[in-house]
Amino acid sequence: MACVKFPWELMEEILYRVPSLSLSRFKTVSKEWNTLLNDKTFIKKHLALVRPQFRLWTNSKVYSVDVSLNDDPNIELRELPLDIPYVIDHRTTNFLPCNDLLFCASWWSNKAVVWNPSLRQTRLIKSGEEHFRFGGIGYDSGRPGKGYHIFGHSHSRLSVNGNTSKFIKRFYITKFESNAWKCIDDVSLGENSIGGDSLDNNNVSLNGNLYWTTNSYDTDEYLIQSFDFSKEIFKIFCVLPRKKDSSDIPVLSVFRGDRLSVLHKFKGTNNMEIWVTKNKINESVKAVVWMMFMTVSIPIYKDSKPSYFINDIYEKRLVMCCSDENGKACVYIVKDQARKKIQLGFHVSEFSHCFYDPSLIPIPSETSGQKISNS
């Protein structure tokens, strides 16, 4: 049987639609294919067409959940290799997407891992501080090529007048290009809400900056705080639409790739509100305007935190990964008043999850001792 050779343009169009995990294996087909799959233009076009995913972790397995939003929405559940070094217990690990990489940090550990699941690349990050907690990853938006930075904080006891002491929270950053950590701020605990209780487990990365929710000690309002990696400063970004006395801890997500969304679940009910920012998030924004996107009633497990994304290209849809009222993993797809629940089919009572856009963007190569592993 004669071998049929496809036109190169047609081959590119096909490869744009191949899942990232499969594409990474095609780099060994030929030098021409390897050049194409590493090309920045190809990576950008592929990312624009990739289907959204959730990542789920148990203590023994990792799953990807591909979501297809056609006329009859469905999901595809796939088990992935569990090849993240130093991530032992998902219950004490935070997973933060940033520019299509995943930042995996265990609580009060001096180790974290930057991971690209599609390329099966990992990079270990270490801190020499005791009682250290990683807060997230971002980059200097003013630099070409995205100079990634890692952010975290430590707690220590400081003696005062020789006989009393107080706890000090110290914030640090390090650049990917080096192993050197720099202290950027000292804060006395109880005197300032910088960081807040949600810095480590309710943050998002957008345009290189970190955003997270906290609450004002004075007004009981929920706030979004941010850290600008290019200027190395904290600031109060905005006040959220709901107060602490009416809703559980709000859940942030990225909307349209350049805006923020927030999910408020009302205490003691299944009722939720999803709000989105009207304008793009950038330095020119002086006042943040929030718009109601959707109200919905979804029964989820008590005190559980959902992961979600919004799709409004053609119709308003909310896609949420969570534990249902019985503690079982599921995905809800909501459109107008229609709500579809899809059980994920594995039976574990505890798991972690996050929304993630898979991509072929490689982890920046080492320059000073930080090693990249290709599993």
Curated annotation (Swiss-Prot):
Question: Pfam families attached here?
Answer: F-box, FBA_1
Please describe, based on the UniProt annotation, the reported consequence of changing A287D: In strain: cv. Bur-0 and cv. Wu-0
CDD domains linked: F-box_AtFBW1-like
Q: Which domain of life is it from?
A: Eukaryota
Name all F-box domain ranges. Answer: 1-46
The protein here is known as Putative F-box protein At1g12190
